[in-house]
């Protein structure tokens, strides 16, 4: 006689009207003195388990009745269809074994403050909404990789520890690196990613990046995940087309694969998908200033377009908008100077609506050796630290372009969340390094 199969909530359909073993955690319990309904979490889904005193006997039934939230258990019973249960099945319990007790679980069904929940992040991840966000994140990660692999991009794993500054020296995390001086946590994989376009034309990387920005806004983390792409021979205009297609494709695929999770989050994806049905407008930084000034904003050429002003522009255009050709002094050394207006560079930021803000930054890269050395000097960066990067401009240099997208902001937009701290399993912020 075969053993009773151990099954997960993921594939219950194969075992209807059979005796099965389910292992999981008590998500909740309710009932009467004759029967109890146990919500059992397994593989991220909730299975309803019916425990009847008449079947189990008084002693086992009382054990079930007094189970506490997050107790881990092994349950044996008969699996039946039940359209009224959360996932269409119900387990009629025959026996139960307690695997691990759970005493005084701190996150109860009552309301808790966000600071408390973040401090209990290692436990909060078990909640239905947080699990839904994790699944959306997983779906987005899959969609990103699928997009690039289907278009012949090669994944390049870029280093986390680096001796070169990728963005701003003022936002670096540094550490001593043996006898070689300081090493830095990577702000971007871009410089290393550029090396690989000479081998494979189209490449991307996807991993954690770090910014020591003293910012406490709802859009900033000190550690976040960024996907970056580089394409040999690509112009600024071609780069914009790639970015728009990339964003639209991965959002649509993620939403399609996350319908139930978005339902848990009470996120109606229809308004989000509607944004994707039209072309994203592209406006120059100078034009953006003119629009803002017409709305009474006190802003002059060279000023930063802050998050509030970004949102004014998304309202003006009714959705996402590219702002291109920013002042060169405000942007990184590797961005190509705009030949039509040397005050600016050939870059663009994609600004998302609904308070999300910038989700992509991209540019055409400077391919000329002398020009990029000059830009390094302007930024007061040590040229010798970039010898390896400058070699790329000596041996078969070509025009090329690329971009970077912060996945947490995109997740926040897809899920309709106000703060990026819930979009990564363990958020790192100015005031948060635990757990």
Curated annotation (Swiss-Prot):
Q: What is catalyzed by this enzyme?
A: tRNA(Asn) + L-asparagine + ATP = L-asparaginyl-tRNA(Asn) + AMP + diphosphate + H(+)
Subcellular location as annotated: Cytoplasm
Entry-linked SUPFAM superfamilies: Class II aaRS and biotin synthetases (SSF55681), Nucleic acid-binding proteins (SSF50249)
Main localisation: cytoplasm
| GO terms of biological process kind | asparaginyl-tRNA aminoacylation
Is DNA-binding tagged as a keyword? no
Would the keyword Ligase be found if you checked this record's keyword annotation? yes
Q: Provide a Gene Ontology MF annotation, just one.
A: nucleic acid binding
Name any one Pfam family assigned in the record.
tRNA_anti-codon
Which domain of life does the protein's organism represent?
A: Bacteria
EC no. given is 6.1.1.22
Q: Name one GO cellular component term.
A: cytoplasm
- What keywords tag this UniProt record? Aminoacyl-tRNA synthetase, ATP-binding, Cytoplasm, Ligase, Nucleotide-binding, Protein biosynthesis
Q: Subunit structure of this entry?
A: Homodimer.
Q: Which family does it belong to?
A: Belongs to the class-II aminoacyl-tRNA synthetase family.
**Which protein, by its recorded name, is this?**
Asparagine--tRNA ligase
Species assigned in the record: Leptospira interrogans serogroup Icterohaemorrhagiae serovar Lai (strain 56601)
Report which gene this protein is encoded by: asnS
């Amino acid at each position: 006689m075969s053993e009773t199969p151990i099954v997960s909530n993921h594939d219950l359909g194969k075992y209807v009207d059979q005796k099965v073993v389910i292992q999981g955690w008590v998500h909740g319990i309710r009932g009467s003195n004759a029967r109890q309904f146990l919500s059992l979490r397994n593989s991220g889904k909730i299975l309803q388990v019916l425990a009847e005193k008449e079947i189990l006997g008084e002693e086992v039934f009382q054990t079930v009745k007094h189970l506490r939230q997050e107790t881990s258990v092994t349950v044996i019973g008969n699996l039946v269809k039940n359209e009224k249960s959360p996932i269409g099945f119900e387990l009629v319990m025959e026996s139960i074994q307690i695997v691990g007790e759970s005493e005084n679980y701190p996150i109860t069904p009552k309301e808790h403050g966000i600071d408390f929940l973040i401090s209990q992040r290692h436990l909060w991840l078990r909640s239905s909404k947080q699990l839904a966000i994790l699944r959306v994140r997983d779906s987005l990660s899959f969609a990103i990789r699928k997009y690039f692999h289907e278009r012949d991009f090669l994944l390049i794993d870029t280093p986390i520890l680096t001796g070169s500054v990728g963005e701003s020296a003022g936002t670096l995390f540094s550490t001593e690196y043996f006898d070689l001086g300081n090493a830095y946590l990577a702000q971007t994989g871009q410089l290393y990613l550029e090396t690989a376009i000479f081998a494979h034309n189209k490449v991307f990387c996807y991993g954690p990046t770090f910014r020591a920005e003293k910012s406490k806004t709802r859009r900033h983390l000190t550690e976040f995940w960024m996907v970056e792409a580089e394409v040999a021979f690509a112009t600024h205009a071609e780069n914009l087309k790639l970015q728009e297609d990339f964003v639209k494709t991965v959002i649509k695929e993620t939403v399609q694969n996350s319908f139930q999770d978005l339902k848990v989050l009470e996120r109606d994806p229809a308004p989000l998908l509607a944004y994707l049905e039209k072309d994203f407008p592209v406006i120059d930084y100078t034009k953006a200033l003119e629009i803002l000034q017409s709305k009474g904003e006190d802003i002059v050429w060279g000023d930063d377009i802050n998050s509030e002003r970004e949102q004014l522009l998304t309202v003006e255009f009714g959705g996402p908008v590219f702002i291109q050709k920013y002042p060169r002094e405000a942007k990184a050394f590797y961005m190509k100077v705009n030949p039509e207006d040397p005050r600016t560079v050939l870059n663009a930021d994609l600004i998302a609506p609904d308070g999300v803000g910038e989700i992509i930054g991209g540019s055409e890269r400077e391919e000329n050796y002398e020009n990029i050395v000059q830009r390094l000097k302007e930024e007061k960066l040590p040229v010798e630290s970039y010898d390896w990067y400058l070699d790329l401009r000596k041996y078969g240099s070509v025009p090329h372009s690329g971009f970077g997208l912060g996945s947490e902001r995109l997740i926040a937009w897809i899920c309709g969340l106000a703060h990026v701290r819930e979009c990564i399993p363990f958020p790192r912020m100015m005031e948060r390094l635990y757990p």
